[in-house]
Amino acid sequence: MSDNSVSSENDKPSLKRYQALVAITFGHAAKHLYNGAFRTLLMPEIKFGFGLNSAQYGILGTISSTSWWIFTMIGGYFGDRFPHRAGRMIAISLAGMGIGYFIVGVMPTYILLIPAFLLIGAGPSFFHPPALGELSRLFPDKRGFAVSMHGFGANIGEVVGPLIVGYLLSNLLDWQEILKWSILPALGSALLILLMVPSRARKSPKDNKKFTYFLDLRAALKNPLLVMLIIALATKSFSDGAVGYFLPVYLREDPLLLFTPNQVAYLFVLSHILGAIIQPLIGYASDRIGWKIMLVGGMSTIMFSTMLIGLSSVIVEISIVKDLGVSLIHLIVFAILIWGSLHFSLHHTFIGASLDVSGEESQSTVVSLVYGAGILALISPYLFGLIIDSFGYYITFIIAGIFLFIPTGILTSLKFPVKR
């Protein structure tokens, strides 16, 4: 066989892995196109449309988060038991997401919304374990890059989704019609994944072991560094339950702000554009200088921005701040741009670090653990809704910011293996 023939054969796996990377990044962008627009613009519309208080609104978030957590863990099991069928599982996730949004769009009452939100959580959650597991297997030498590209797709979706939905809400459709029509592009994205990430032959007998996932889960939990990363992410997720669900509503409801849907969309879009720029840089830096600096720096910055949102009404009353002409809106916009630009970037840095410290095996199991760390976020939307109903938004964001001292301290104490 000629040298050219050998080179051509060796190039095929490389081309296939980059094809899978492009497809999974696109699928992740499609997923977050829905998620970003739903939480940023459509969830507030549901609250206003049904006349919900913050606790009732928080219940929807808690229901969705609970379903999301359960199916993330299930996704980890299937992702590691059937790694050769990752494309099918990703496609099922995207299709299920579209069906879930459609069902929410046709529900006429708040009581019926509650079970419908179980589907809202289930579809998207099934995406990450097989997708990130596949990327980790395909890119063992460039994990930081592959995971950051996966996160880059999320940022793109978070940019495009609010712009599209903001335009539709302002000019063409109401929120229920948007949710009904959303099933079509979701099914189209699922079909694309099926074509570009095809199933492959089973590689080892391990794929047939029904209980491999649970053994891998137990083995992963014996890794102390991985466990501490999971605990840090779990405590961060509690704060995310306040900021993620209630920040868009706060911008719409606060009498000193009263943002329009398009203004909310533009603000979050700008933050995610910054995130899309930062994400690959963080991935590159993580591969070069290590995970700890990026994790501690990112967590500290998110803690600062969350506290700034909560304290903004006090800060603008300080005389030197007044003299500088800084208004409440200036501070809020500044804080949200920081928070939004790092939110997904930091999460995917957690994923990359967890995959790296766990070794080569059971990547989907590790991903399900990382996303399963959101267990503390299950109840936080409802709890923070109760706090908002009693004390208002500012106290809520201050509490969420204070809580981030815990993961920041944990990350500061960790010792990661030296990058070589």
What is each residue range found by the language model?
Residues 2-16, 200-229:
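Juxtamembrane intracellular "pre-TM" segments in multi-pass secondary transporters
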Residues 38-40, 225-276:
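Extracytoplasmic gate region of multi-pass secondary transporters
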Residues 70-108:
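Conserved MFS/SLC helix-loop-helix module at the cytosolic interface between two early adjacent transmembrane helices
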Residues 71-84, 279-290, 388-389:
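Helix-to-loop junctions at the C-terminal end of transmembrane segments
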Residues 117-153:
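Cytoplasmic helix-loop-helix junction between adjacent transmembrane helices
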Residues 158, 357-391:
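A late C-terminal transmembrane helix in Major Facilitator Superfamily
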Residues 177-195, 397-412:
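Symmetry-related core transmembrane helices of the 12-TM Major Facilitator Superfamily/SLC fold
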Residues 291-350:
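C-terminal transmembrane helical hairpin of 12-TM major facilitator-type secondary transporters
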